[in-house]
Amino acid sequence: MNYQQARDFLDQLQFFKIKLGLDSMTRFLNRLGNPQQHLHCIHIGGTNGKGSVGATLCSILSAADYKAGFYTSPHLSSVRERFRIGNTYISKEDFARLMSKIEQVLDGNQITYFECTTTLALLWFAEQEVDCVLLEVGMGGRLDATNVITPLVSIITNVSMDHELYLGATLAQVAGEKAGIIKKQIPLVSAVADDDSGEVIRQTCEERNAPLFLFGQAFRGRVGEDASRWQYQGLDGQLLNDLPMAMKGNYQIGNASLALATVQLLNRQGWSINEEHIRTGLAQTRWPGRLEYFRRKQEGREDCPEGLRFLIDGAHNPAGVAALQQALKDFSFRQLILVWGAMVDKDLGTTLQTIAPMAGTIIFTRPESERSASPEQLQAALPPTLEPKIILTGSVQAALEQACALAAADDLICIAGSLFLVGAARQLLLGDLVNE
């Protein structure tokens, strides 16, 4: 099996619907020698911020000379983005070889796309003998394919409404699914709110005798005197001042604080990560497609010698879009040009009505996904009074061309609503993250 054949094999698994449950995953891993049993893992769940926490931890662990594996989803443009060690993505050769092994062991049995990528990640990390795996939950937690490990530390970033069809119609129900990654006597780090979801998390920790370390109580983070720096108060009360923050958005302080609390718990278990490692790791953290700001020069635009300004963000649920709206207040611009695409199963009205009033122009488009909402469906989610500033386009390419044609040097083009859209737009604007 070569790389293209491996991709084709994986892609055809998308036709199997999302399947929540661990029985088939457990049996399959057993046939592969249970690679997960040879790994030291940190399990990262929650509604928003999982990737940011994982990217921060990966950077800090790498700065401390640990071999850190990071498994995340979804990807922006290449499936190989889901698997990396430090800053190195899985090679085409390793991807194809391990996919071939999976196909042989499957022997015609059914597996989902996410079960397959999770299995490949566990195999690769075990084979590469990584020191630590940062394993991001795909959806929920209790029945997620990643929930086959016993981690060193569990993390639940936060809980808000998302994937209601699978996880439940109330915060408490969603929290119950995410609490499924809490293991007996394994510490949990969380920034869950003091609401129904927080009560579920606290109660589950008590039932499983899992030590709970809450942001705002056991540890804290806040903006420093210089807005580009921040302060962390740790589990032992120690203050770390004037910390760097490579990622944009004040909400990233909460995500970084979760990472630092996790680092402290690792140190309590015998790891060796010092303040210098933390500062270096924080300064070098990169997480593409999440409040990612850049300029791009346009041919024939002498009025924009430094290029047009872009901000791309994967916000796709009410809480994520609210965070994006808040972050936009830190940018100066004459006009906000919003390029938006979303999945039809999302809360289109709530998300759009949060951010649409900030925009001078709204360009709706449709990412390439069978779950994508049509531009007309997106327009219908907004009140008729906003129609004069709405433009409908049939492709991401057309949406970007329209946005660039309308934008002036002091405007900001914000692309958001779906990671499918962000991935496609980023690829068109900046090229591939991973060379395909």
Regions found by a protein language model. Give the residues of each.
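A conserved segment at the C-terminal end of the G1
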Residues: I44, S52-G69
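Short internal beta-strands
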Residues: Y71, P187-V192, L338-W340, G360-E368
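Short glycine/serine- and small hydrophobic-enriched flexible loop segments
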Residues: L123-A126, A261-R268, Q427
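ATP-dependent carboxylate-amine ligase catalytic core
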Residues: F16, L22, T26-L39, A63-I149, ...
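C-terminal helical cap/extension that packs against the catalytic core
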Residues: D194-F213, G224-D226, P305-I312, P318, ...
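Nucleotide phosphate-binding/pyrophosphate-handling subdomain across enzymes
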Residues: H38, C132-V137, D144-I155, V159-H163, ...
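Extended acidic/charged loop-beta regions that coordinate divalent cations
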Residues: T117-Y166, G198-D242
